[in-house]
């Protein structure tokens, strides 16, 4: 298997390109060499996550926490593999927890014509995963200086962005994409597209020095201004 390169974002923070820059996971390592993994890509990406872990000199036994921005299969699909490898359950916002437990998906936006078609199709297959902690808005997970949970529902009911308070990295999740520029997730893949656009405004109110996306490369130069400009124009 080809080595999965980890992209440094800040001291102790890496982006894992799982399908090029189009689908990303993240690794955090604290001063005690413990590791938190955030988002594990599609079903076949679990092995890539573990390879990226080894590429920074860590292993399965160093992982103390798995976290998901939301329940969709391009983020949670690889979680079962990584959970087995590390022996850890996944932590996810309480409004998405049951979908991960049952391997199911939330309904898509009924105002989308293609979304209406999707509602008639069976859920994409995704392995069930044990859930550890059900996260809530405003909660600060005690790891590497604090991971603040920012509930940004709409793309899914329990979608959350994560602010790494010590390193100044914002992980947007799918609240905003950075594929060929900033853009919204596709309406047909959202549970409530209008809510997606409304709750993403919260990301313009936060302080951070790097904006990292689960879809697309990071923004290192004036990220908050870039996010606020997008929100003002597209919101």
Task: List the predicted regions and their residue ranges.
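Conserved beta-strand hairpin/beta-sheet module of binuclear metal-dependent hydrolase folds
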Residues: 3-56, 161-173
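Metallo-beta-lactamase
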Residues: 8-9, 42-44, 96-153, 157-233
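Divalent metal-coordination and catalytic microenvironments
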Residues: 12, 28, 39, 49, ...
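Short, well-ordered secondary-structure micro-motifs
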Residues: 26, 102-104, 223-224
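Residue-level marker for buried hydrophobic side chains located in beta-strands
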Residues: 36-38, 67, 90, 169-171, ...
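Active-site HxH/HxHxD metal-binding segment of metal-dependent hydrolases
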Residues: 44, 54-133
């Amino acid at each position: 298997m080809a080595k999965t390169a980890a992209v440094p974002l800040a001291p102790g923070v890496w982006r894992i390109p799982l399908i090029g820059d189009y689908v990303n996971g993240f690794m955090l390592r604290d001063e005690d060499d413990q590791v938190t993994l955030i988002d594990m890509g599609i079903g076949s990406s679990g092995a890539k996550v573990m390879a990226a872990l080894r590429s920074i000199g860590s292993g399965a036994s160093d992982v103390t926490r798995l976290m998901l921005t939301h329940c969709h299969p391009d983020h949670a699909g690889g979680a079962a593999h990584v959970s087995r490898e590390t022996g850890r359950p996944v932590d996810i916002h309480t409004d998405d927890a049951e979908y991960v437990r049952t391997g199911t998906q939330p309904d898509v936006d009924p105002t989308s014509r293609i979304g209406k078609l999707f509602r008639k199709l069976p859920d994409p297959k995704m392995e069930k995963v044990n859930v550890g902690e059900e996260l809530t808005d405003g909660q600060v997970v005690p790891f590497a200086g604090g991971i603040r949970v920012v509930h940004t529902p709409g793309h899914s009911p329990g979608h959350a962005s994560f602010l790494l308070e010590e390193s100044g990295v914002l992980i947007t999740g799918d609240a905003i994409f950075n594929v060929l520029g900033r853009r919204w997730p596709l309406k047909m893949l959202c549970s409530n597209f209008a809510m997606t656009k409304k709750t993403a405004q919260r990301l313009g109110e936060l302080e951070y020095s790097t904006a990292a996306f689960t879809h697309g490369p990071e923004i290192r130069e004036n990220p908050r201004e870039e996010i606020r400009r997008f929100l003002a124009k597209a919101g």
